[in-house]
Amino acid sequence: DPTSIHIVAPTGVYRDAYVPSSLREMSDSELADLWMKELMEGIDGTSIRAGFIKLAMSDDGPMPLEIRNLKAAARASQNTGAVIAIHTIGGRVARQEMDVLEEAGLDLSRFIWVHAQTEPDLSVLKEAARRGPYIELDTVGAPFQSQDQLMEAAIALIESGLSDRLLLSHDAGWYNPARADGLPDSGYRGYTALAEDFIPALSARGISEETTHQITVNNPARAFAF
């Protein structure tokens, strides 16, 4: 309330090893029904509705239970319009996800490839973007991430006419239950690097204010609307 910032909570599930026992035996349609309820009615009996579906895939590609999760997410998205954001390491895994989602009938414009900067081949990023999903480059401002790599990936997408498929994120501020202070092992990072450093750097490289507005305002608004 003090900042008027909108906080969007997800429904969904993490990768195979972290799926709770209560969800492991569900069919894809049963899981989709659960997620649709959290999107349209509220989470865990509250009136707080989820605003998107979040999944995670194993680094070597979707495992059988994760394929079930993809099918459930596609069903829930098709019935609600909610976007699906997926923790995805590398272009090969992203292609596998997109194939499963498309086969399940999903319009790939309702899919966000989270952590797309983990794919170093810019041609793979552009190929993926042309299939319709949002390409999210995150860890902006992170000490463990090359900011030059993020910059080159963003510019490659923009110069290829794909700025409407680009999202930028800090991937910061999450709570770590393994530590008493709740901080990630890499330490606390705020939410200022994008506005204070990355966008000015894009401008210095000749990217217009209209384009940066599209990437930071219009694209996320369109992605999360349903």
Regions found by a protein language model. Give the residues of each.
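Short acidic/histidine-rich active-site segments
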Residues: 138-139, 162-186, 212
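Structural preference for beta-strand elements that scaffold enzyme active sites
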Residues: 6-8, 50-52, 83-85, 110-112, ...
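Active-site gating/metal-coordination segments in enzymes
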Residues: 1-78, 134, 139-144
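Active-site glycine- and acidic-residue-rich loops that bind
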Residues: 114-119, 138-156
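Divalent metal-binding pocket/active-site signature
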Residues: 42-120
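Alpha-helical scaffolding segments of alpha/beta enzyme cores, especially the outer helices
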Residues: 30-37, 41, 68-79, 96-103, ...
